Amino acid sequence: MAVQQNKPTRSKRGMRRSHDALTATHVSVDKTSGETHLRHHVTADGYYRGRKVINK
């Protein structure tokens, strides 16, 4: 079983974890319906970029 030779420093631990942070989701508001949605996704009522693309 592998055993470390020396204790990793707080700096090395922080550098390893520097890419682990979560980013906030990008939310847009539809021009026509005013509904919020994820970027490049259809809204819940079927609008995309101001046009009705899905009939419910």
Swiss-Prot record:
Protein's GO biological process: translation
Q: Which Pfam families match?
A: Ribosomal_L32p (PF01783)
CC annotations in GO:
large ribosomal subunit
Q: Which UniProt keywords apply?
A: Ribonucleoprotein, Ribosomal protein
Q: Do the record's keywords include Nucleotide-binding?
A: no
According to the UniProt record, where is the region Disordered? 1-35
Tell me a Gene Ontology molecular-function term this record carries: structural constituent of ribosome
- Which portions of this protein are annotated as coiled-coil regions? none
Specify whether NADP is a keyword of the entry. Answer: no
Question: Into which family does the record put it?
Answer: Belongs to the bacterial ribosomal protein bL32 family.
What NCBIfam families does the annotation carry? rpmF_bact (TIGR01031)
PANTHER family recorded:
50S RIBOSOMAL PROTEIN L32 (PTHR35534), LARGE RIBOSOMAL SUBUNIT PROTEIN BL32 (PTHR35534:SF1)
Name the UniProt record assigns to this protein: Large ribosomal subunit protein bL32
